[in-house]
From Swiss-Prot:
It comes from the Archaea. It comes from Pyrobaculum aerophilum (strain ATCC 51768 / DSM 7523 / JCM 9630 / CIP 104966 / NBRC 100827 / IM2). One of its GO terms (cellular component) is DNA-directed RNA polymerase complex. It is found in: Cytoplasm. CDD domains: RNAP_L (cd06927). HAMAP family: RNApol_arch_Rpo11 (MF_00261). GO terms for biological process: DNA-templated transcription. Disulfide bonds: none annotated. DNA-dependent RNA polymerase (RNAP) catalyzes the transcription of DNA into RNA using the four ribonucleoside triphosphates as substrates. It catalyses: RNA(n) + a ribonucleoside 5'-triphosphate = RNA(n+1) + diphosphate. This is DNA-directed RNA polymerase subunit Rpo11. GO terms for molecular function: DNA binding; DNA-directed RNA polymerase activity; protein dimerization activity. Part of the RNA polymerase complex.
Length: 92
């Protein structure tokens, strides 16, 4: 059984997203923030983890153009593409 990501949207509008991910630390958000930081449509992106025993990550994203969910989708697609390329490099 795969783990379920538990997200609580704290704020969402046409240019800004703030959420809390329960049970998450750096593993998910470090690469996501890295890829979003390279997106020219992103004004800023950050995440913070509360006390390590709590394992809650807080994520904030503000975009200049488009909407924050589209920016996340682009970043996730880029991450998946890079992982597929890495996999081909190892197993081809």
């Amino acid at each position: 059984m795969s783990p379920v990501l538990r997200l609580e949207i704290l704020k969402l509008d046409d240019k800004y997203l703030e959420l809390k991910a329960k049970g998450e630390t750096y593993t998910l958000f470090s690469p996501l923030v890295e890829y979003l930081s390279n997106d020219p449509d992103v004004e800023y992106v950050q995440f913070d983890v509360d006390h390590p025993l709590q394992e809650n990550a807080y994520f904030k994203l503000k975009v200049k153009r488009g909407n924050p969910l589209e920016a996340i989708q682009r970043a996730v697609n880029a991450i998946l593409s890079d992982l597929e390329e890495l996999e081909r490099g190892f197993f081809s």
